[in-house]
Amino acid sequence: MSQDPILTSKGSQEEEEDFFGLDNFFPEPESPLPPPFSFASYDIPANIDFYVPDHRKSLILRLVGSHPLWGHHLWNTARTLSTYLLETPQITQSRHVLELGAGAGLPSIVCVLAGSSKVIVTDYSDEGLLDNLRFNVDVNLEGEEKERIAVDGHVWGQSVDPLLGHLPKGQKYDLLILSDLVFNHSQHDALIKTVEATLTSSSTQSYDPSNPSAPLTEPSILVFFTHHRPHLAHADMAFFPRLAESGNGWAYEKVVEEWAGAMFENDPGDKKVRGTVHGWRAWRVRDGEERGEKPSRISL
Protein backbone atom coordinates (compact mmCIF):
# COMPACT_ATOMS: atom_id res chain seq x y z
CA MET A 1 0.00 0.00 0.00
CA SER A 2 1.29 3.44 -0.85
CA GLN A 3 2.91 5.43 1.91
CA ASP A 4 3.23 8.60 -0.18
CA PRO A 5 0.40 11.02 0.62
CA ILE A 6 0.07 13.56 -2.20
CA LEU A 7 0.53 17.11 -0.95
CA THR A 8 -0.81 20.02 -3.02
CA SER A 9 -0.26 23.77 -2.79
CA LYS A 10 -2.29 26.60 -4.23
CA GLY A 11 -1.04 28.42 -7.28
CA SER A 12 -0.99 32.20 -7.60
CA GLN A 13 -4.34 32.29 -9.43
CA GLU A 14 -6.04 30.34 -6.66
CA GLU A 15 -4.50 32.61 -4.03
CA GLU A 16 -5.79 35.63 -5.95
CA GLU A 17 -9.30 34.17 -6.04
CA ASP A 18 -9.20 33.50 -2.32
CA PHE A 19 -8.02 37.07 -1.69
CA PHE A 20 -10.92 38.56 -3.62
CA GLY A 21 -13.38 36.20 -1.98
CA LEU A 22 -14.45 34.60 -5.27
CA ASP A 23 -14.95 31.30 -3.50
CA ASN A 24 -17.91 32.89 -1.76
CA PHE A 25 -19.56 33.65 -5.11
CA PHE A 26 -18.70 30.36 -6.78
CA PRO A 27 -18.68 27.72 -4.03
CA GLU A 28 -17.23 24.34 -4.92
CA PRO A 29 -19.81 21.60 -5.35
CA GLU A 30 -20.16 19.19 -2.48
CA SER A 31 -18.03 16.08 -2.72
CA PRO A 32 -19.95 13.00 -3.78
CA LEU A 33 -20.83 10.50 -1.10
CA PRO A 34 -18.13 7.90 -0.53
CA PRO A 35 -18.74 4.50 -2.12
CA PRO A 36 -20.55 2.08 0.21
CA PHE A 37 -18.68 -0.56 2.17
CA SER A 38 -18.48 -4.08 0.83
CA PHE A 39 -17.95 -7.33 2.68
CA ALA A 40 -15.86 -10.45 2.15
CA SER A 41 -15.40 -13.63 4.14
CA TYR A 42 -12.58 -16.03 4.89
CA ASP A 43 -13.55 -19.65 5.50
CA ILE A 44 -11.64 -21.25 8.34
CA PRO A 45 -9.98 -24.51 7.22
CA ALA A 46 -11.99 -27.54 8.32
CA ASN A 47 -9.04 -28.99 10.26
CA ILE A 48 -8.67 -25.85 12.40
CA ASP A 49 -10.80 -25.58 15.53
CA PHE A 50 -11.26 -22.38 17.48
CA TYR A 51 -14.16 -20.22 18.59
CA VAL A 52 -15.46 -17.43 16.39
CA PRO A 53 -18.35 -15.18 17.54
CA ASP A 54 -21.80 -16.62 16.83
CA HIS A 55 -20.11 -19.98 16.17
CA ARG A 56 -19.43 -18.91 12.62
CA LYS A 57 -17.24 -21.01 10.36
CA SER A 58 -15.85 -17.94 8.65
CA LEU A 59 -14.42 -14.52 9.45
CA ILE A 60 -16.29 -11.52 8.10
CA LEU A 61 -14.29 -8.60 6.77
CA ARG A 62 -15.68 -5.19 5.94
CA LEU A 63 -13.82 -3.42 3.13
CA VAL A 64 -13.69 0.32 2.59
CA GLY A 65 -15.74 1.37 -0.42
CA SER A 66 -12.77 2.72 -2.37
CA HIS A 67 -9.28 3.84 -1.44
CA PRO A 68 -6.09 4.85 -3.28
CA LEU A 69 -4.12 2.59 -0.93
CA TRP A 70 -6.05 -0.48 -2.17
CA GLY A 71 -7.74 -1.20 1.15
CA HIS A 72 -11.02 -1.86 -0.65
CA HIS A 73 -10.01 -5.41 -1.63
CA LEU A 74 -9.50 -8.60 0.36
CA TRP A 75 -6.47 -9.85 -1.53
CA ASN A 76 -5.90 -13.53 -2.26
CA THR A 77 -2.46 -13.09 -0.72
CA ALA A 78 -4.05 -12.32 2.66
CA ARG A 79 -6.18 -15.46 2.42
CA THR A 80 -3.21 -17.68 1.58
CA LEU A 81 -1.07 -16.11 4.29
CA SER A 82 -3.82 -16.58 6.87
CA THR A 83 -4.11 -20.27 6.05
CA TYR A 84 -0.33 -20.62 6.35
CA LEU A 85 -0.43 -18.99 9.80
CA LEU A 86 -3.17 -21.36 10.97
CA GLU A 87 -1.38 -24.42 9.63
CA THR A 88 1.99 -23.35 11.09
CA PRO A 89 1.00 -22.52 14.68
CA GLN A 90 4.54 -22.51 16.08
CA ILE A 91 5.27 -19.35 14.15
CA THR A 92 2.51 -17.35 15.88
CA GLN A 93 1.65 -18.87 19.26
CA SER A 94 2.68 -16.78 22.27
CA ARG A 95 4.41 -14.26 20.00
CA HIS A 96 4.30 -10.49 19.68
CA VAL A 97 3.10 -9.82 16.13
CA LEU A 98 3.10 -6.64 14.04
CA GLU A 99 1.34 -6.37 10.68
CA LEU A 100 2.22 -3.52 8.33
CA GLY A 101 -0.09 -2.21 5.61
CA ALA A 102 -2.84 -4.48 6.88
CA GLY A 103 -5.83 -3.46 4.74
CA ALA A 104 -8.77 -5.40 6.19
CA GLY A 105 -6.55 -7.00 8.86
CA LEU A 106 -7.33 -10.66 8.18
CA PRO A 107 -3.87 -12.12 9.01
CA SER A 108 -3.73 -10.15 12.28
CA ILE A 109 -7.14 -11.39 13.37
CA VAL A 110 -6.07 -14.93 12.54
CA CYS A 111 -2.93 -14.51 14.66
CA VAL A 112 -5.04 -13.61 17.69
CA LEU A 113 -7.27 -16.65 17.17
CA ALA A 114 -4.16 -18.82 16.74
CA GLY A 115 -2.79 -17.77 20.14
CA SER A 116 -0.46 -14.80 19.64
CA SER A 117 0.10 -12.97 22.92
CA LYS A 118 -0.09 -9.48 21.39
CA VAL A 119 -0.94 -8.31 17.87
CA ILE A 120 -0.65 -4.77 16.55
CA VAL A 121 -2.40 -4.29 13.23
CA THR A 122 -1.36 -1.18 11.32
CA ASP A 123 -2.00 0.69 8.14
CA TYR A 124 -1.35 4.18 6.86
CA SER A 125 -2.60 6.83 9.28
CA ASP A 126 -5.89 7.37 7.49
CA GLU A 127 -8.88 7.42 9.81
CA GLY A 128 -11.11 5.63 7.30
CA LEU A 129 -8.69 2.70 7.07
CA LEU A 130 -8.12 2.54 10.82
CA ASP A 131 -11.82 2.75 11.69
CA ASN A 132 -12.47 -0.11 9.30
CA LEU A 133 -9.78 -2.20 10.97
CA ARG A 134 -11.39 -1.55 14.35
CA PHE A 135 -14.74 -2.66 12.95
CA ASN A 136 -13.26 -5.95 11.71
CA VAL A 137 -11.62 -6.57 15.07
CA ASP A 138 -14.94 -5.99 16.86
CA VAL A 139 -16.88 -8.29 14.53
CA ASN A 140 -14.47 -11.23 14.71
CA LEU A 141 -13.03 -11.15 18.24
CA GLU A 142 -14.51 -11.15 21.73
CA GLY A 143 -13.44 -10.86 25.35
CA GLU A 144 -9.79 -11.43 26.14
CA GLU A 145 -9.02 -12.03 22.47
CA LYS A 146 -9.94 -8.43 21.73
CA GLU A 147 -7.61 -7.32 24.54
CA ARG A 148 -4.67 -8.94 22.71
CA ILE A 149 -4.98 -6.80 19.59
CA ALA A 150 -4.67 -3.07 18.93
CA VAL A 151 -5.06 -0.93 15.83
CA ASP A 152 -2.53 1.81 15.10
CA GLY A 153 -1.42 4.03 12.24
CA HIS A 154 2.12 3.97 10.91
CA VAL A 155 3.97 5.53 8.00
CA TRP A 156 6.81 3.23 6.95
CA GLY A 157 10.23 4.59 7.78
CA GLN A 158 8.93 7.00 10.43
CA SER A 159 9.27 6.73 14.20
CA VAL A 160 8.32 3.33 15.59
CA ASP A 161 8.05 4.53 19.19
CA PRO A 162 4.21 4.36 19.13
CA LEU A 163 4.38 0.78 17.83
CA LEU A 164 6.87 -0.32 20.47
CA GLY A 165 4.78 1.46 23.10
CA HIS A 166 2.22 -1.35 22.87
CA LEU A 167 4.78 -3.81 24.31
CA PRO A 168 6.51 -4.02 27.68
CA LYS A 169 9.41 -1.59 27.90
CA GLY A 170 12.50 -2.78 26.05
CA GLN A 171 10.71 -5.47 24.02
CA LYS A 172 10.19 -5.69 20.27
CA TYR A 173 8.17 -7.93 17.95
CA ASP A 174 8.85 -11.61 17.29
CA LEU A 175 6.99 -11.76 13.97
CA LEU A 176 6.27 -9.14 11.33
CA ILE A 177 3.67 -9.64 8.60
CA LEU A 178 3.99 -7.96 5.19
CA SER A 179 1.12 -8.99 2.94
CA ASP A 180 1.09 -7.67 -0.64
CA LEU A 181 3.35 -4.71 0.10
CA VAL A 182 6.45 -5.24 -2.05
CA PHE A 183 4.67 -4.06 -5.21
CA ASN A 184 5.27 -0.56 -3.82
CA HIS A 185 8.83 -0.40 -5.11
CA SER A 186 9.56 3.20 -4.13
CA GLN A 187 8.86 2.34 -0.49
CA HIS A 188 11.17 -0.68 -0.09
CA ASP A 189 13.78 1.31 1.85
CA ALA A 190 11.17 2.84 4.16
CA LEU A 191 9.59 -0.56 4.75
CA ILE A 192 12.96 -2.10 5.60
CA LYS A 193 13.68 0.75 8.00
CA THR A 194 10.52 -0.07 9.95
CA VAL A 195 11.32 -3.79 9.86
CA GLU A 196 14.83 -3.20 11.23
CA ALA A 197 13.50 -1.02 14.03
CA THR A 198 10.67 -3.28 15.22
CA LEU A 199 11.81 -6.92 14.96
CA THR A 200 13.59 -8.22 18.03
CA SER A 201 17.24 -9.10 17.56
CA SER A 202 17.28 -11.77 20.24
CA SER A 203 17.99 -15.17 18.72
CA THR A 204 17.15 -18.43 20.43
CA GLN A 205 19.10 -20.66 18.07
CA SER A 206 22.69 -20.86 16.83
CA TYR A 207 23.52 -21.44 13.19
CA ASP A 208 23.88 -25.08 12.14
CA PRO A 209 25.59 -25.44 8.71
CA SER A 210 23.98 -28.86 8.24
CA ASN A 211 20.54 -27.26 8.59
CA PRO A 212 20.72 -23.81 6.99
CA SER A 213 17.09 -22.92 7.58
CA ALA A 214 16.34 -20.98 10.75
CA PRO A 215 13.76 -22.61 13.05
CA LEU A 216 10.23 -21.30 12.66
CA THR A 217 10.46 -19.95 16.21
CA GLU A 218 13.30 -17.62 15.19
CA PRO A 219 12.26 -13.93 15.10
CA SER A 220 11.31 -13.40 11.48
CA ILE A 221 9.20 -11.57 8.94
CA LEU A 222 6.70 -13.12 6.56
CA VAL A 223 6.60 -11.48 3.13
CA PHE A 224 3.71 -12.77 1.00
CA PHE A 225 2.76 -11.29 -2.36
CA THR A 226 1.50 -11.81 -5.87
CA HIS A 227 3.13 -10.32 -8.96
CA HIS A 228 0.10 -8.23 -9.91
CA ARG A 229 2.15 -6.63 -12.70
CA PRO A 230 4.14 -9.50 -14.23
CA HIS A 231 6.43 -7.21 -16.19
CA LEU A 232 7.59 -5.73 -12.86
CA ALA A 233 8.13 -9.03 -11.03
CA HIS A 234 11.88 -8.37 -10.90
CA ALA A 235 11.21 -5.09 -9.08
CA ASP A 236 8.99 -6.89 -6.54
CA MET A 237 11.78 -9.39 -5.89
CA ALA A 238 14.37 -6.62 -5.48
CA PHE A 239 13.05 -6.21 -1.95
CA PHE A 240 14.90 -9.33 -0.77
CA PRO A 241 18.51 -8.57 -1.78
CA ARG A 242 17.97 -5.05 -0.47
CA LEU A 243 16.77 -6.50 2.84
CA ALA A 244 19.69 -8.96 2.92
CA GLU A 245 22.19 -6.09 2.75
CA SER A 246 20.54 -4.01 5.47
CA GLY A 247 21.68 -3.92 9.08
CA ASN A 248 23.85 -6.90 9.99
CA GLY A 249 22.38 -8.97 7.17
CA TRP A 250 19.33 -11.11 6.52
CA ALA A 251 18.64 -14.58 5.13
CA TYR A 252 15.41 -15.62 3.46
CA GLU A 253 13.65 -18.72 2.17
CA LYS A 254 10.50 -19.50 0.20
CA VAL A 255 7.79 -21.19 2.26
CA VAL A 256 4.74 -20.99 -0.03
CA GLU A 257 3.96 -20.99 -3.73
CA GLU A 258 0.27 -21.47 -4.37
CA TRP A 259 -2.20 -20.80 -7.15
CA ALA A 260 -5.00 -18.63 -5.74
CA GLY A 261 -6.51 -17.19 -8.91
CA ALA A 262 -6.03 -13.82 -10.55
CA MET A 263 -7.60 -10.93 -8.65
CA PHE A 264 -8.61 -9.11 -11.82
CA GLU A 265 -9.52 -11.29 -14.78
CA ASN A 266 -8.88 -8.72 -17.50
CA ASP A 267 -5.63 -7.24 -16.25
CA PRO A 268 -2.63 -7.47 -18.61
CA GLY A 269 0.05 -10.10 -18.19
CA ASP A 270 0.26 -13.84 -17.73
CA LYS A 271 -2.75 -14.96 -15.69
CA LYS A 272 -0.77 -17.72 -13.99
CA VAL A 273 1.79 -15.19 -12.78
CA ARG A 274 -0.93 -12.80 -11.60
CA GLY A 275 -2.74 -15.55 -9.73
CA THR A 276 0.14 -17.22 -7.88
CA VAL A 277 0.88 -16.28 -4.27
CA HIS A 278 4.52 -16.40 -3.16
CA GLY A 279 5.40 -16.58 0.52
CA TRP A 280 8.86 -15.92 1.95
CA ARG A 281 10.25 -15.91 5.47
CA ALA A 282 13.26 -13.78 6.39
CA TRP A 283 15.39 -13.56 9.53
CA ARG A 284 18.54 -11.82 10.71
CA VAL A 285 21.64 -13.89 10.01
CA ARG A 286 23.08 -15.76 12.96
CA ASP A 287 26.78 -15.98 13.81
CA GLY A 288 28.58 -17.73 10.96
CA GLU A 289 25.57 -17.63 8.64
CA GLU A 290 25.74 -16.10 5.17
CA ARG A 291 23.15 -13.56 4.15
CA GLY A 292 20.89 -14.07 1.15
CA GLU A 293 18.56 -16.75 -0.21
CA LYS A 294 18.41 -20.21 1.38
CA PRO A 295 16.99 -23.46 -0.03
CA SER A 296 13.21 -23.47 -0.34
CA ARG A 297 11.07 -25.27 2.22
CA ILE A 298 8.65 -26.38 -0.48
CA SER A 299 8.89 -28.88 -3.31
CA LEU A 300 8.18 -27.10 -6.56
Swiss-Prot record:
CDD domains: AdoMet_MTases. It is found in: Cytoplasm. PANTHER family: HEPATOCELLULAR CARCINOMA-ASSOCIATED ANTIGEN, PROTEIN N-TERMINAL AND LYSINE N-METHYLTRANSFERASE EFM7. S-adenosyl-L-methionine-dependent protein methyltransferase that trimethylates the N-terminal glycine 'Gly-2' of elongation factor 1-alpha, before also catalyzing the mono- and dimethylation of 'Lys-3'. Pfam families: Methyltransf_16. One of its GO terms (cellular component) is cytoplasm. Belongs to the class I-like SAM-binding methyltransferase superfamily. EFM7 family. One of its GO terms (molecular function) is protein methyltransferase activity. S-adenosyl-L-methionine binds at W75, G101, A102, G103, D123, W156, S179. This is Protein N-terminal and lysine N-methyltransferase EFM7. The keyword Glycosyltransferase does not apply. Keywords: Cytoplasm, Methyltransferase, S-adenosyl-L-methionine, Transferase. It is an enzyme of class 2 (transferase).
